[in-house]
Protein backbone atom coordinates (compact mmCIF):
# COMPACT_ATOMS: atom_id res chain seq x y z
CA UNK A 1 0.00 0.00 0.00
CA UNK A 2 1.14 3.55 -0.64
CA UNK A 3 0.87 6.24 2.02
CA UNK A 4 -2.54 7.47 0.89
CA UNK A 5 -3.96 3.94 0.80
CA UNK A 6 -2.64 3.44 4.34
CA UNK A 7 -4.36 6.68 5.34
CA UNK A 8 -7.62 5.45 3.80
CA UNK A 9 -7.38 2.18 5.76
CA UNK A 10 -7.07 4.08 9.03
CA UNK A 11 -10.04 6.25 8.09
CA UNK A 12 -12.07 3.04 7.85
CA UNK A 13 -11.13 2.34 11.46
CA UNK A 14 -12.20 5.89 12.38
CA UNK A 15 -15.63 5.59 10.82
CA UNK A 16 -16.60 1.90 10.90
CA UNK A 17 -15.00 0.24 13.94
CA UNK A 18 -16.65 0.72 17.37
CA UNK A 19 -14.85 3.18 19.65
CA UNK A 20 -15.34 2.72 23.40
CA UNK A 21 -14.62 5.73 25.66
CA UNK A 22 -11.96 5.13 28.33
CA UNK A 23 -13.23 6.89 31.44
CA UNK A 24 -12.57 6.76 35.16
CA UNK A 25 -13.11 8.83 38.26
CA UNK A 26 -10.37 11.46 38.39
CA UNK A 27 -9.28 10.90 34.77
CA UNK A 28 -9.53 14.14 32.85
CA UNK A 29 -11.78 13.87 29.81
CA UNK A 30 -9.53 14.07 26.77
CA UNK A 31 -11.20 11.92 24.15
CA UNK A 32 -9.52 8.68 25.23
CA UNK A 33 -11.07 5.62 23.57
CA UNK A 34 -10.17 2.03 22.83
CA UNK A 35 -11.56 0.00 19.94
CA UNK A 36 -13.12 -3.35 19.19
CA UNK A 37 -11.37 -5.68 16.78
CA UNK A 38 -14.38 -5.73 14.40
CA UNK A 39 -18.03 -4.72 14.20
CA UNK A 40 -19.13 -8.32 13.63
CA UNK A 41 -22.34 -9.61 15.19
CA UNK A 42 -23.49 -11.96 16.62
CA UNK A 43 -20.67 -12.36 19.10
CA UNK A 44 -18.29 -15.27 18.77
CA UNK A 45 -15.00 -15.73 20.56
CA UNK A 46 -11.98 -14.20 18.84
CA UNK A 47 -14.05 -12.43 16.19
CA UNK A 48 -15.19 -9.33 18.05
CA UNK A 49 -13.18 -8.47 21.15
CA UNK A 50 -11.44 -5.58 22.87
CA UNK A 51 -7.98 -7.13 22.84
CA UNK A 52 -4.84 -5.22 23.79
CA UNK A 53 -2.56 -6.71 21.11
CA UNK A 54 -5.02 -5.88 18.33
CA UNK A 55 -5.50 -2.36 19.68
CA UNK A 56 -1.73 -1.84 19.79
CA UNK A 57 -1.35 -3.16 16.24
CA UNK A 58 -3.94 -0.61 15.14
CA UNK A 59 -2.05 2.16 16.95
CA UNK A 60 1.10 1.09 15.08
CA UNK A 61 -0.85 1.21 11.82
CA UNK A 62 -1.78 4.83 12.52
CA UNK A 63 1.88 5.71 13.07
CA UNK A 64 2.90 3.86 9.89
CA UNK A 65 0.19 5.68 7.93
CA UNK A 66 1.61 9.04 9.00
CA UNK A 67 -1.14 9.75 11.54
CA UNK A 68 0.98 9.99 14.65
CA UNK A 69 -1.61 12.04 16.55
CA UNK A 70 -4.24 9.30 16.25
CA UNK A 71 -1.65 6.58 16.92
CA UNK A 72 -0.49 8.24 20.12
CA UNK A 73 -4.07 8.83 21.33
CA UNK A 74 -4.95 5.15 20.82
CA UNK A 75 -1.66 4.02 22.40
CA UNK A 76 -2.25 6.17 25.48
CA UNK A 77 -5.90 5.12 25.70
CA UNK A 78 -4.89 1.46 25.73
CA UNK A 79 -2.15 2.06 28.31
CA UNK A 80 -4.68 3.81 30.56
CA UNK A 81 -7.15 0.99 30.00
CA UNK A 82 -4.76 -1.87 30.73
CA UNK A 83 -2.02 -0.55 33.00
CA UNK A 84 -3.98 1.87 35.16
CA UNK A 85 -7.69 1.04 35.10
CA UNK A 86 -7.65 -2.71 34.52
CA UNK A 87 -6.61 -5.67 36.67
CA UNK A 88 -2.99 -5.74 35.43
CA UNK A 89 -1.48 -2.65 37.07
CA UNK A 90 1.69 -1.62 35.29
CA UNK A 91 1.29 -4.44 32.78
CA UNK A 92 -0.97 -5.82 30.05
CA UNK A 93 -3.49 -8.62 30.19
CA UNK A 94 -5.01 -10.23 27.13
CA UNK A 95 -8.50 -8.70 27.06
CA UNK A 96 -9.80 -5.35 28.30
CA UNK A 97 -12.53 -5.08 30.90
CA UNK A 98 -14.40 -3.12 28.21
CA UNK A 99 -14.90 -6.44 26.41
CA UNK A 100 -18.59 -7.16 27.06
CA UNK A 101 -18.34 -10.93 26.62
CA UNK A 102 -15.09 -11.90 28.35
CA UNK A 103 -13.97 -8.92 30.38
CA UNK A 104 -10.46 -8.95 31.82
CA UNK A 105 -8.59 -12.18 31.20
CA UNK A 106 -5.05 -13.24 31.97
CA UNK A 107 -2.26 -11.13 33.41
CA UNK A 108 1.22 -10.32 32.14
CA UNK A 109 0.26 -11.52 28.66
CA UNK A 110 3.21 -11.74 26.28
CA UNK A 111 1.41 -10.96 23.01
CA UNK A 112 0.30 -7.37 23.79
CA UNK A 113 3.52 -6.70 25.69
CA UNK A 114 5.51 -7.50 22.55
CA UNK A 115 3.28 -5.43 20.28
CA UNK A 116 3.24 -2.50 22.72
CA UNK A 117 7.04 -2.56 22.70
CA UNK A 118 6.98 -2.37 18.93
CA UNK A 119 4.55 0.57 18.98
CA UNK A 120 6.87 2.41 21.37
CA UNK A 121 10.05 1.80 19.35
CA UNK A 122 8.80 1.78 15.75
CA UNK A 123 5.75 3.99 16.21
CA UNK A 124 6.26 6.68 18.82
CA UNK A 125 10.04 6.93 18.40
CA UNK A 126 9.97 5.79 14.76
CA UNK A 127 13.16 3.69 14.80
CA UNK A 128 13.18 1.69 11.54
CA UNK A 129 16.48 -0.09 10.78
CA UNK A 130 17.13 -0.84 7.09
CA UNK A 131 20.55 -2.45 7.24
CA UNK A 132 20.25 -4.01 3.76
CA UNK A 133 20.38 -0.45 2.43
CA UNK A 134 22.94 0.71 5.02
CA UNK A 135 20.50 3.15 6.62
CA UNK A 136 18.30 3.61 9.66
CA UNK A 137 15.16 5.68 9.28
CA UNK A 138 13.98 7.78 12.21
CA UNK A 139 10.34 8.87 11.85
CA UNK A 140 9.37 10.35 15.24
CA UNK A 141 5.67 10.28 16.09
CA UNK A 142 5.74 12.65 19.05
CA UNK A 143 2.69 14.77 19.95
CA UNK A 144 2.99 18.36 18.76
CA UNK A 145 3.21 19.77 22.28
CA UNK A 146 6.23 17.66 23.32
CA UNK A 147 9.46 19.64 23.59
CA UNK A 148 11.70 16.74 24.59
CA UNK A 149 11.88 12.95 24.40
CA UNK A 150 14.56 10.29 24.55
CA UNK A 151 14.96 6.56 24.08
CA UNK A 152 17.82 4.10 24.51
CA UNK A 153 18.08 0.59 23.07
CA UNK A 154 21.07 -1.77 22.85
CA UNK A 155 21.73 -0.65 19.25
CA UNK A 156 20.71 3.01 19.08
CA UNK A 157 19.77 5.94 21.30
CA UNK A 158 18.46 9.32 20.40
CA UNK A 159 17.31 12.44 22.16
CA UNK A 160 14.95 15.09 20.84
CA UNK A 161 14.76 18.64 22.22
CA UNK A 162 12.81 21.69 21.05
CA UNK A 163 13.66 25.24 22.06
CA UNK A 164 11.44 27.85 20.45
CA UNK A 165 12.03 27.47 16.68
CA UNK A 166 14.88 24.95 16.85
CA UNK A 167 14.52 21.16 16.89
CA UNK A 168 17.60 19.07 17.71
CA UNK A 169 18.11 15.32 17.39
CA UNK A 170 21.16 13.69 19.01
CA UNK A 171 21.66 10.16 17.63
CA UNK A 172 24.09 7.58 19.02
CA UNK A 173 24.62 4.25 17.25
CA UNK A 174 26.18 1.08 18.61
CA UNK A 175 26.00 -1.09 15.48
CA UNK A 176 29.21 -2.82 14.44
CA UNK A 177 29.06 -0.74 11.25
CA UNK A 178 27.21 2.57 11.71
CA UNK A 179 24.22 3.08 9.41
CA UNK A 180 23.27 6.28 7.60
CA UNK A 181 20.65 8.06 9.73
CA UNK A 182 17.69 9.29 7.67
CA UNK A 183 15.41 11.60 9.62
CA UNK A 184 11.80 12.00 8.46
CA UNK A 185 9.93 14.84 10.18
CA UNK A 186 6.75 16.80 9.55
CA UNK A 187 7.21 20.43 8.61
CA UNK A 188 5.79 22.36 11.55
CA UNK A 189 6.22 25.87 10.14
CA UNK A 190 5.91 27.54 6.76
CA UNK A 191 9.64 27.89 6.14
CA UNK A 192 12.94 26.23 7.04
CA UNK A 193 15.67 28.67 7.99
CA UNK A 194 18.45 26.09 8.18
CA UNK A 195 19.29 22.41 8.48
CA UNK A 196 22.62 21.34 9.95
CA UNK A 197 24.26 17.95 10.47
CA UNK A 198 27.01 18.00 13.09
CA UNK A 199 27.10 21.79 12.79
CA UNK A 200 27.56 21.80 9.00
CA UNK A 201 24.80 23.11 6.68
CA UNK A 202 22.96 20.23 5.04
CA UNK A 203 20.29 19.70 2.39
CA UNK A 204 16.85 18.22 2.80
CA UNK A 205 14.27 16.68 0.48
CA UNK A 206 10.48 16.66 0.43
CA UNK A 207 8.70 13.29 0.41
CA UNK A 208 5.95 13.52 -2.19
CA UNK A 209 3.80 10.69 -0.79
CA UNK A 210 3.19 12.53 2.49
CA UNK A 211 -0.27 13.64 3.58
CA UNK A 212 -1.57 15.88 6.33
CA UNK A 213 1.74 17.76 6.63
CA UNK A 214 4.73 18.16 4.30
CA UNK A 215 7.31 15.52 5.21
CA UNK A 216 11.03 16.29 5.14
CA UNK A 217 13.87 13.80 4.69
CA UNK A 218 17.36 14.60 6.01
CA UNK A 219 20.21 12.12 5.47
CA UNK A 220 23.51 12.01 7.34
CA UNK A 221 26.72 10.04 7.07
CA UNK A 222 26.97 6.80 9.03
CA UNK A 223 28.89 7.69 12.18
CA UNK A 224 28.56 6.61 15.79
CA UNK A 225 27.31 10.05 16.86
CA UNK A 226 25.17 12.46 14.83
CA UNK A 227 23.45 15.74 15.68
CA UNK A 228 20.77 17.08 13.33
CA UNK A 229 19.43 20.59 13.91
CA UNK A 230 16.42 22.13 12.16
CA UNK A 231 15.61 25.81 12.56
CA UNK A 232 12.10 26.86 11.53
CA UNK A 233 10.62 30.27 10.85
CA UNK A 234 7.40 32.10 9.88
CA UNK A 235 3.97 30.87 10.99
CA UNK A 236 3.03 27.36 12.18
CA UNK A 237 1.34 25.01 9.73
CA UNK A 238 -2.19 23.87 10.45
CA UNK A 239 -4.21 21.10 8.85
CA UNK A 240 -7.81 21.58 7.80
CA UNK A 241 -10.46 19.94 9.96
CA UNK A 242 -11.80 16.68 8.60
CA UNK A 243 -15.35 17.12 7.33
CA UNK A 244 -17.33 13.91 7.16
CA UNK A 245 -19.09 13.38 3.81
CA UNK A 246 -22.88 13.44 3.71
CA UNK A 247 -24.40 10.40 1.99
CA UNK A 248 -27.90 10.71 0.54
CA UNK A 249 -30.54 7.95 0.65
CA UNK A 250 -29.53 6.71 -2.81
CA UNK A 251 -26.01 6.02 -1.59
CA UNK A 252 -24.40 8.93 -3.42
CA UNK A 253 -22.53 11.90 -2.04
CA UNK A 254 -24.95 14.71 -1.26
What is the predicted role of each segment?
Residues 57-254:
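Non-catalytic C-terminal accessory modules of carbohydrate-active enzymes
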Residues 1-50, 83-85, 94-98, 150:
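Extended glycan-interaction surfaces of carbohydrate-active proteins
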Amino acid sequence: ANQFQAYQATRYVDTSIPHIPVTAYGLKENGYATIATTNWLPYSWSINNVAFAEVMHTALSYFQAGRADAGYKLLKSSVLDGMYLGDSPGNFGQISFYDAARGVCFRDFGEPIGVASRVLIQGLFGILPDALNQQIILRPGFPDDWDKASVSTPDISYRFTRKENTDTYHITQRFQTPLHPVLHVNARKEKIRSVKVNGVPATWQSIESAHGYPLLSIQAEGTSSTTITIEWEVAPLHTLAVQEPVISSNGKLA
